[in-house]
Amino acid sequence: HRMSVYSQKILTETAADTGVQYEQNSKGLLYLYRNPEVLAAGSEHVSLLQEAGQELEIVGKERALEIIPELADSQDQLAGGVFSPTDESGDSRIFTEQLMEVCRSMGGTFESGVSIEQLDASGTEIKRVVTNRGVFSADRYVLSLGAWSPLLAQKSLGVRLSVYPVKGYSITIPVEKGHTPPRTGGLHEEDLLGFSPMGDHFRVSSVSEFCGYDLGHTPEDFEHILKTAKRLFPNAGNYDKVEFWSGLRPMTPEGTPILGTGRHSNLFYNTGHGHLGWTMSCGTARITADLIAGKTPEISTELMGVR
């Protein structure tokens, strides 16, 4: 939670400094509940977060419908929810692409189509990165390969990272004339479904599956997401033109990322963000930059190091 709050601050600063636009929606997020008893149980966790400084509001059905009036068609299945007015949503791909252009304008370079074959080390330092497009050498290196981080670390360095691939699925629904997607994003806590308005598209994600590095998917894999999305928001978009996607979340047992150096003093880890990759991205990037520059990060990374 501490990392997520810090990262949101850095993301906001980054967006303001660079001017990147990414279908950002600053109307907060609503966490929905169908069962009153489950909502009551969830309220206990809300108290802990409120004590930690998080702005949260426990809401009944009427208030939930004020926040997301598009839930009217499924209000008979709505007990209430928890509203976080400071949370935001947006399109992470657009954010990343625009930030890449900002970096290029500052002299940064990006190499596409490059596969890392080996990290060469001597003693406690990384000396070079061997790829299919040649050898790259630098003073400092950052290992940030998502779910593939542990494969390279183990193969090249014999370092075992507690990062495991967990497959998630999402659908993107085009919003056409006459459609009424929710204007505020959120999550359905019991159906384990996240939803986010993105301009002329509406994205819904769900499911966690342990299947190694398999990226394939079948129509059956999306049945739960489609069924629940249609039940909650029947007029959100054109469900006949849905785009399907699956990807791997780099999960750690504790749910916290792995940051800092290990046995190699010039290799900085920034991986294991799980399902909160974009949420924690700017914060962990700032921390990594601070560590590379020899600065003390603004927040502690205790218990987030390589073990």
Residue ranges and their predicted role:
Residues 1-8, 31-41, 62, 66, ...:
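Short beta-strand to alpha-helix junction loop
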Residues 13-24, 54, 105-109, 159, ...:
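Surface-exposed helix-capping loop/turn segments at secondary-structure junctions
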Residues 72, 118-121, 125-126, 135-265:
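Active-site substrate-recognition segment that forms the wall
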